Structures are given as C-alpha cells and as structure tokens.
Amino acid sequence: MRSVLACERELAELRFTWRLIETTAKMVCPAEAKTILPAMASTREAFGRLETELVRALAAENVNKVVLQMRARAQAVVDVVVRNLYERTADVGFLATDDDIRGFLRANANGRERLEARLHEYIRKYSVYDAIFVLDLRGEVRAAIGVSPESTAGDPSLLERALAAPGYVEHFGRCALLPERERALVYARRIDDTDGRALGVLCLSFRFDDEMAGIFRTFRRPRDRAVMLLLDADGHVIASSDPDHVPLGRTPEGATGADGALIDFGGREYIACTCEATGYQGYAGPGWRGHVMVPAESAFREEAVALQGAGARSSGLNCSELATIEAQAGAIKDALNRVVWNGQVMAGGRRGDSLKLKSMLQQISETGERMRAVFSRALAALSDTIMSSTLQDLQFVSRLMMDVMDRNLYERANDCRWWALAPALREALASGRGGSSLGTFLDDINRLYTVYDRLFVYGADGRIVASSSLSGAADDTIGRQVDGRAVDAVNRLASTQSYAVSPFEASPLHRDAPTYIYHAAIRAPGDDTRVVGGIGIVFESAREFRAMLSELLPARDGVWAAFCERDGRVVASTRQDLEPGSRLDLGELAAGLDAGASRHALIDFDGVRHMAGVALSAGYREYKTTGDYRNDLVAVVALALPEASAAARDTDAGLGEIEGGVRPGEGEEFAVFRLDDRHLAVSAGQVLEAADIDRVRRIGSGEGLVAGVLPLDDAGGLEHVPVVNLRVFFDLPRADGRGHVVVTHSARGRLGLLVDDLISVTECGPNDIRPVPEMVAGRFRWLDRLIITGRDRPLVSALDLDALYDMLRDQVRGELSDADCMLQDEVLSA
C-alpha cells in the first residue's frame, strides 16, 4: 500500500513540526505564546488522533477494496456453476420422459441408430453436454452419443442409485461410462413408462472442464495474478484458472470464509476468499465453493481508475467513516484558524516579543497549510479508493448480470429448436392436424418450463393451430395469425440448428406486453428440408429478467439495474419508473463497447450524478457467437451519488490572507472574517477572541437571530455573552458548515458574532480605508467603513459595532438582556 505509507510518512513529519513549533514558542516568546499554547496542544492532540484514524481508514479501505473484488469473483464462480447445473437437473428430468426413448426401451428391438440420431440433435442444441447414455435395467448401454460405438459397459453403482432415487442423481468423479476420464459430472434419471414402470436410466455428461474454463475466462481481469478455484465439499480443488500454479486435488489451507484471510500456499503468502453457493430456485448445488487467491505482494497494486476529476468527488459518497474523518479534519482546520487568528489579534499593534509571536504564527499558518494539503490528499485518496472500489464492483456486477442473461437465453434458443423436433408436432402439422392433443402436449411442457408464458404451434401459413393454456385464453389464441415477419423468418430457416427471435416489442400473445418470442421451424417427418410450420415460445420476460437483476443486485441503498438495448430502450429494470419499453438515456456509456466488454463511468441519469457499470452481451457458447442471432443488449448497474454532506467540506480552503498596503505598525488593524460570499471586519482592538461554536449554549431552537449565549470568564466573573446569527440578520440562507464565534466588545457591551470562516488580521493604511458613501450610509447603519484590499481582491465591509448592537437590540426586543433567563443546557449544533 504505497499510498498509505506515503501518507503516514507525511503525517509523521507534520507531527514532528508541530512539536518543534510549540517548543520554539515556549523558548522565544513564552509570555505571549502562553495564551495560545493550550489551544495548539489541543489541536496537536486532535491531529494525532485523526492521523491514526486516517491511516487506519486508508489501510482498511484498501483491504476492503481487494476483498470486495475477490469476494465478488469467488461468489460468481460458484453461483454461475450452480445456476447452470440447476438447468441440467431440469434437462435430465424432461428428457427422461421423451416418448422416443421410452418407445425404444419398451420395444427392446432395433432402432438404436434412429434414437442416436435424435440424441445427436439434442446434443447439438444443448452443447453443454458431451455424451448421452441410455441404459436398460441391466445397466447395459442401449444407445449412446459422444463416445465410441463399441462402448457398452455401464456403471452398476450409478444405475443402482438412479433406479432407487425419486428424482435426479448428480455424480462427480470417476464413472465407468467414461473410463478414459479422471472425473466426470453426470446427471442420471430413471426412465419410467407412462404407467410408472421403470424402463431404464438416462445419463447426461456435462462438459465440466470446458464450462469452468469459460467461467474463468469471463471473470479474468487484465494483468490478473489472482487464481480462481472451485472447491468441492471437502475443500479439494476441482477446477483452477491456473492449474500449473494451483493444481487439481490440492487443498488450500484457511479456505473458510468470505471476509478474506491471509494464508500460506507453496511458500508464499496469499489473501484468500471463499464463498458458499447462494443456491438457485431451491437447488443448493453439490456443496461446492468458490475460492480466489491473490499473492499478498501484488494484491494492493495501484490501479488507475478514471474518476473524471473534481466531478467525482464533489458529490461525495454515502460513507459514514469518510464523512466522520472529513468532519474531524474540518474541526482541526477551524481550531487552527482560531489559534492563528487569536494570536494575530493578541499580537496586533505591539512590538518586541509580539513580533516574534507573529513570526511563530506565520510558521503555524504555513504548517497548517501543509497539514491541510496532506489531509486533502489523504481524504481524496480515501474517497478515490471507496469510489474506485464501488465503480469496479458495479462494473463486475453488470458483467455478471449480462453473463447470466446470455446463459438464460441460450436455454431458450435450445428449447424451441428441440421441441420443434418432437415427432408429435412434426406428424400433426405434416398431416394438417391440430386440436386438443397438441394443446395437451404443449401444456405438459409448459408445466415443467414455467419461464414461458405460452407455447404455440402454427402452420406454414402462420395460423396458430395449438397453444398451451396455462396462462389462459388458449381458445382465443387458436386461429390467430402470427406476425408475418416471424413466419417469413421461420420459413427461411436453413436447418434444425436455426432459430428466429422476435424484436423486443408488445405482443397480443403476451397480454400486449413487450417480450421476446423464440421461433423454430417444424419440419416434415423424414424430410428436414420441408418446413410445415413453426413453434413459438413466449418468454416471461418481465418476471424473469427482473428476477435476474434483483438476485444479483448489490445489497446497498440506492443501487438499481437495467437491461437495455444499445439505444437505451429498457428491456427490464429494478426501478418502478423504468418500465419495459421506456427509454434510459445512456449517453456515451455503452458507445464503442465490443461484445463481452464492460466499463465503469460517472454519468448523469435524470439530472442526478451516478456511478455506473455497463457490460455488453457476449453470448454463450454458440448462442450469439456464430452469426446465428444478433441483439446487442447491455446491463447497467448504477448508484446515485448523494449530495455532499455538511461534513464533506473543502479542506483545501486554507486561512486566507488579505494584505493591506502599509508597513507594519503604521496603519490600523482589522480582524477580517467571511459570511457567505461577503468579507466583513471589525477593528482588531474590539475583538476579544474567536471561540469554538461548541461553547455556545442555545436559546430556543438556536436558529433565530439570537443563536444563544457564550459563557465567558474574566476578572469580573462568569458572563454570558449574547451570540447573534449574522446570516439571519443579513437574511442569508442557513450555512452547511460549523462556523466560529467572533467575541467583540464596544461601548454598548459585549457581543458574539456567528460567522462562517476566519480570514486574517490585516493592517491597513489611510489609502486602504474609505468612508461609507453618503447615499447608502443611512440605509446601512451597521456599516462603518470600506476597506480596499487591492485590484481583483474582495471589498471588506467594516462593521460599526455600536450601531449593530442598537439595531440588534431593537430587532430582538429585549432578548439580549433576557438571555441568561432563557439559557438551555443544549449545545448549538451547526
């Protein structure tokens, strides 16, 4: 953490400088410095506390950033696998009810070649499988695809488990069906006849190694030194993004939690993060875990994250720790301003040791400027770390959302093509039959595949002849004409591998809501060149897409996500006001993105500044990667930046200097302060001190003209000095910051002035001071003189404290004299 170490060194040097100034002041001008040394000591102690807190926060945020990125990847590795395997449990269950497979086993006759041709079509569509086996009750292989024809040996153990299980069996390890492999992931399911009698077992071999290689490619980052692993329930590595580094079968020590831990592996230290599977649709997975390891020496390598300058920080972040540190830094700045300002007031118009004090005050001021610069850089680094971490998290989640969507729609393309090959559909359309039997067939599928609102079948002319009825109105659907564009596309499909997808638009087949409808051609039995109709499957897009977004959305307030087309047309969103079909102004967010690419950026949505991550669809396997179909969708994940809090103040704004044009000791000194955008002043001789606002005790709400009273000890005892809110007097809006109290005295009495900031104590000559123009003197009774500070410098208004006191007394009608009676125990808060 080079940036943290550099900050720590700078802060240590400042701490030494503070002590040196204090020691020098005690030696050079002990009497004059005595009044400010306690405040200096208090400020130094606060600086020390903040130094510790700031370094700790910087280190913690850097660690948090690394762990957050590791956790996201570890979680994604296992969750993407589990989501995929959930689909496999559904596949084996559905295919085990296939009439062709049942008929083949029931007949116990020849027909293997025909069945294997059908299974070959299945594996061409569902390319996540590399082998399919149909076993009889003796365990013999009756049909197989993806292995050598001579392979007839079954797997007795797998057969026994599948025949006894009420559902699917998930097997990972050695399998007699695939003897050449060290391990295989196989899904098995008993094949039952329509009367419930067992006929055999169906086994699907999942392309596990190929799938994991694809997942690792998706989540690998440029210049990546992290190793992504998949661990089994016993902690053994079953997949590795770098098997030369972390081979299969190893057991990383300390792979126990998602919060990150330091572990030893192969003689090196790593930061490691392990995540359990979230589960999907009630399926918990095989008990596997995602694990990510990053070498400790490279984990905190600085990464350039474009934050687009001041615009990134001006809005602040909703981080309580950062706000607290900024507030503490602001309080130290205020305290330092008061030390210097009070010292300047005390040293004003004096000679001798007081000139030495002025020199010391100059050193304090310069050191304070250094301190503010260091804190400003450190706070900017802390803010940038938090922001870059958030931006990278949003980008990663957008990529994950897009990957999940692509994988989901890959299944939709497979389903429509496979169901189009159903013999019942081919024979019915070729013979011109429709009717209730086809509707029942479609209902049976729809009950198992609830991601679809409706399945329908139509002839070559586009007229619907059958529809599932689970969503209602099947009778109204039959006879309806399918969109001509879809019919033309289906009639032109070249092979059983081809499919067509409607644009995302409203459809009467989906309650007039926008959706995608996947189409495949139904071909004549025995003649794949003749199209006799088509099947359309209506995706339940609003529900399913919103579920994808919601399940993957980061758990933090203000985050939202959307799937959009490149032009910003919304497909789905987690925001209620972004309905499907509406528009989201993406600006240049997705411009120039290639397939599978992602980025993060700061962008305005609806006039509100957001951090956002965006990813463009990459497709999955052959889906959208082979020229079969193009639909450039993007996933957007965004977090609104809150308005800067009162604590998020500009720590770069140091103690300003307003210089008068006179040699020291020859002019009149003024104590200058700021109120909103105005510079005001009082004669330095009329200033007792600048006090911390926390010393003020409220009167009423503390927000009126009289803010409260300031207890002040002097030789005469305790006095409560009324404190006036000058913003209320000048009809200015309430300030966000804390402010200071300038305690003054005049012939009328003592008065505290609540101001925004302290500027300086400056000496002005006769040429710098102007009388109030007669035209405005009557209107502005509180204005005593005008101070000219030079070209392009602010005009300073010197206050007439006696006139101001009289005006205030008239306005509050006795509140000043009765202030002690209205005293409350509360402390004024800004």
Residue ranges and their predicted role:
Residues M1-E61, R250-S389, D585-G656:
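Extracellular/periplasmic juxtamembrane segments that couple receptor/chemosensory ectodomains to their
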Residues R15-G167, G348-S495, L549-L552:
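Extracytoplasmic/periplasmic sensory segments of membrane signal-transduction proteins
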Residues R112-Y126, V201-D259, A296-C319, G435-Y449, ...:
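Solvent-exposed, extracytoplasmic
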Residues E116-A117, E121-S205, D210-A213, D259-C273, ...:
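Extracytoplasmic/periplasmic ligand-binding sensor regions of membrane-associated signaling proteins
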Residues E657-G702:
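The feature marks the first
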Residues E669, R698, G704-A707, P722-R750:
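DNA polymerase processivity clamps
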Residues L688-P711, D757-D792:
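Flexible, small-/acidic-enriched active-site or ligand-binding loops
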Residues I769-R770, E774-A830:
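Mixed-charge, glycine-accented linear interaction segment located at domain edges/termini
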